[in-house]
C-alpha cells in the first residue's frame, strides 16, 4: 500500500496488516526479484507516483497522471530501458472539444496531464541510448487518438534527431483492451 493511501479507512479495513507493506516515495523496496522505486508525479489527485522497476539487468519506468515532467522525474526517464508514459491529449482537440473551460484549464495545467507534444519533449530530452521501447498510455477518448499521439511524439523526436523505429520503438497502448505480453530484454 502506498503511504499516501495507507491512512484510507477503506484500505485499512480491507487489507490485513500482514498483507500490506507501506511504501514511501523515493525509497526503493524489493518484491521478489524486483527493485521498485516509487517517485512523485505532479497531478491534482492525492499523492500520485510513478515507478522505476529493475530486474535482471532491465529498468522499466511507468509514469502516468503527469501534469509536467519535473527535474526529479527526469533521471527515471534517463534510466529506463523501457518506458510507459502518458500522452494524454492534443491541446487543439481539447480547446475545440466539449470540455468546460475549468476542466480544460485543469488538464492543461502543471498538475493535469501531459500533451502529446510535451510527452515527446520529455522523451527526447531525457532518454538515454539504452532506451529500447516507449509505450504511450492514458490517451483521452475525447481529446486524442492513437494515430495522432504517435505521429506527434514521433515528429517531436525527429526534431531532436531521434528516429522512432530506429533509435527505439514507439507504440500506443490501447485504452480499454489488454496488451499482449512483451519480453523485456537487457
Model-derived regions: residue spans:
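Short, flexible loop segments at boundaries between secondary-structure elements
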Residues: 167-179
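Glycine-/small-residue-rich active-site loops that bind phosphorylated ligands and cofactors
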Residues: 1, 43, 69, 141-142
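Short glycine-/acidic-enriched loop or helix-start segments at secondary-structure transitions
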Residues: 6, 11-12, 48, 72-73, ...
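Generic structural signal for residues in well-ordered beta-strands
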Residues: 20-21, 36, 170
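Active-site HxH/HxHxD metal-binding segment of metal-dependent hydrolases
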Residues: 1-28
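Active-site neighborhood of phospho(di)ester-bond hydrolases with catalytic His/Asp-centered motifs
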Residues: 1-5, 61-64, 84-86, 134-137, ...
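Cap/insert and terminal regions of metallo-dependent hydrolase folds
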Residues: 71-170
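Core dinuclear metal-dependent hydrolase active-site scaffold
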Residues: 24-82, 177, 181-186
